[in-house]
Structures are given as C-alpha cells and as structure tokens.
Amino acid sequence: IDILINNASAISLTPTPDTPMKRFDLMMGVNARGTFCCTQACLAALRDSAARGRNPHVLNISPPLSLRDHWFAPHVAYTMAKYGMSMCTLGHAREFRPWGIAVNSLWPRTAIATAALQMIPGVDPALCRKPEIMADAAWHLLREDARASTGQFLIDDEVLMRHGIQDLDGYAVTPGNRRLLPDYFID
C-alpha cells in the first residue's frame, strides 16, 4: 500500500436536539474512528512503502480546522466528526513524518455534485462542481514528495492552480456559472 485515501463519511446536518445518539455514533464511527482505524491498519504497509522509496501518502477528505462557532452551531455532531478526521491529519502528519509518510487533508471549495448532496435539502446541483475536481487535485497532491508535503489542509482549486491549472470552468456542473455554492468549513 503506497496510498490511503480516507474518503468515507457519514453526514447529518442536524442541530443537537434533532441528532439521535445512533446518528451521532454513526458519524463519529465512520468519520473520525474510521479514518483512525484505516490509517492504523495500513501503517505497516505504508512504512514499508517509505522504506522502499515509494512516496507513501495518507489523504483525508476533511476540512481545514477552524474553531469559528458558526461551523459548530448548526450541526455540532457533524462538525465534530469531520474535524476528528482533520485532527488525524494534524497528529498523524507529525507522528509519521520521521518515517517519510505524508498525511494531508483535501477539501472542496464548493459543494460537489455527489450522491451525498442529495441528502441536503434545497441544494441545486447546478451550483456545484463535479467530483473530477477533487480527483484531479488528489492526483496532483499524491505525486508530491511525501517528505516535503505533509501536515497540510488543502483546498481543491488551490492545489490545481499551484500545479498550473487556471481554468476551472470545466469542473462546474454548469460551465460558466460563477455563483458556485461554497462548501462547509470554508472561511
């Protein structure tokens, strides 16, 4: 194993009174615990990859950490679960640095037109970007030197621009649309 992408996630954008403990446990289990468990399970193989010079990476699909209360108030449980993934990035990047394993987070600037989007009432897919933007950003990021590029919280379009891709219009569900819906956790 040279690359681990922790993308699995459970979502419930509900306030505290409307979040059953079963839903809370699901989000924490899939998002935070799942990221930790998968990373732990792959660690020996990732260390072997590093020893063989194969540039190992862990990429968590999780947001930049921000303690601004407006990200917590509407959906404390979901924010805690997603930030649990981001805290894995923060801790594992430092822990795994001596072994030459990169650990980074990647997050979309805008809403992405995926099946998960259908769980959010009232979101128009025409205001979103396609999943390909995240795939392309991940591809570029995972090619970077693991020893030099770790512990970062990156945004998809910034990664692409850093790699010379300036025209992002093709990633929009509706090309030419400049009114894209910002994703959660983007300040």
Q: For each of these PLM feature ranges, what is it?
A:
Residues 47-98, 110:
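Catalytic loop of short-chain dehydrogenase/reductase
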Residues 15-16, 20-25:
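Substrate-binding pocket helix/loop in short-chain dehydrogenase/reductase
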Residues 39-40, 90:
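A short, exposed helix-loop element centered on a Lys and neighboring polar residues
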Residues 2-3, 25, 53-61, 101-104:
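Conserved catalytic-site loops of classical short-chain dehydrogenases/reductases
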Residues 98, 105-106, 122-187:
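C-terminal helical subdomain
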Residues 14, 69-70, 101, 105-120:
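Short beta-loop-alpha junction of Rossmann-like oxidoreductase domains
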Residues 7-13:
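Conserved NAD(P)H cofactor-binding loop of Rossmann-fold oxidoreductase domains
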